[in-house]
Regions:
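Thiamine diphosphate
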Residues: 1-166, 170, 175, 306, ...
């Protein structure tokens, strides 16, 4: 069925709520409004306001309440309205949610999913366009994932909700309206922690996640017209990282370019580069390169396109690798 990224998430939430009465949604404007991106549209009407709960604008309280519900046997799903709004909840997520497994020796579970629209592409400035994923990927006790397609949005939200671990679920907001085919009745083709090889290639490996996967695939098409084949990998899981899939590719291509919207400095690309350098040093034909946002907040709408990684910047990095 052809559907949008947002509609695929909606169906995933609906199916999870149908399957388990303990699945409860919490967030700002998710009920009557259906969320600012309409991901939860009609769910309150169909399941009631005791399972789709409109909350005050207080992210720390939202996550704290959901955490308490998770400890009592529910499977809450929180929507943080915009990426920059997650910071008031940072203490709850990092100091409480992430630590409960270790604090109790694994005896207490916290099946909590925190959905966060992230990244640019919609012309919104600071607080509404940010890439905070690395803060959570750095935190032991959290799974951090990001789908890039409607099909993965559906399957990954179902998998995340079913886990007994807390999951931070980053949704690339500029992909909410992307359309592709989704099999709502099939089983997931990959575990939640596995990366996906989107295109096979021999000259260089390009790793991306979230909103930059489509950009990397566009770059691969342009490279093919110029006689170069790129292997594009959708990371999907930001923590844990599927190093095996990346390493297998790099051992074949000898070159690696990592793409993300977040600033390059101390970004997730730095961790991937370090791990691949440690593991594949003698296979590398060129330094590992990174393409990311600049070391500034997301700029105003008219400047945003210059801030986000684009095919030209990716291809320039690939050319540097091939010339080494």
């Amino acid at each position: 069925m052809i559907t949008t990224f947002a509609a695929a998430l909606n169906t995933g939430l609906r199916r999870a709520m149908e399957d388990d009465a303990k699945v409860v949604l919490l967030g700002e404007d998710i009920g009557r409004l259906g969320g600012v991106f309409r991901v939860t549209d009609t769910l309150q009407k169909d399941f009631g306001d005791n399972r789709v709960i409109d909350t005050p604008l207080a992210e720390s309280g939202i996550v704290g309440t959901a955490f308490g519900m998770a400890l009592r046997g529910y499977r809450p799903v929180v929507e943080i309205q915009f990426d920059g709004f997650v910071y008031p909840a940072f203490d709850q997520i990092v100091s409480q949610v992430a630590k409960i497994h270790y604090r109790t020796g694994g005896k207490v579970k916290a099946p909590l999913t925190i959905r966060i629209p992230f990244g640019g592409g919609i012309g919104a400035v600071e607080h509404h366009s940010e890439s905070p994923e690395v803060y959570f990927a750095h935190t032991a006790g959290l799974r951090v994932v990001s789908p890039s397609t409607p099909a993965d949005a559906y399957s990954m939200i179902r998998q995340a909700i079913a886990l007994d671990d807390p999951v931070v679920f980053f949704e690339p907001k500029r992909r909410y309206w992307d359309k592709s085919d989704v099999d709502f009745d099939g089983e997931p083709d990959l575990p939640l922690h596995r990366a996906r090889v989107c295109t096979r290639g021999a000259d260089a490996t390009v790793v991306a996640y979230g909103g930059t996967v489509a950009t990397a695939l566009t770059a691969a098409k342009i490279a093919a017209e110029e006689g170069h084949s790129l292997e594009v990998i959708d990371l999907r899981s930001l923590s844990p990282i599927d190093v095996d899939t990346i390493a297998e590719s790099v051992e074949k291509t000898g070159r690696l370019v990592i793409v993300h919207e977040a600033p390059v400095f101390a970004g997730l690309g730095a961790e991937i580069a370090a791990r691949i350098t440690e593991r594949c040093f003698y296979h590398l034909e060129a330094p590992v390169l990174r393409v990311g946002g600049y070391d500034i907040p997301y700029p105003p709408a008219k400047l945003e396109k210059h801030h986000l990684p684009d095919p030209d910047r990716i291809l320039a990095a690939v050319d540097r690798c091939l010339a080494a």
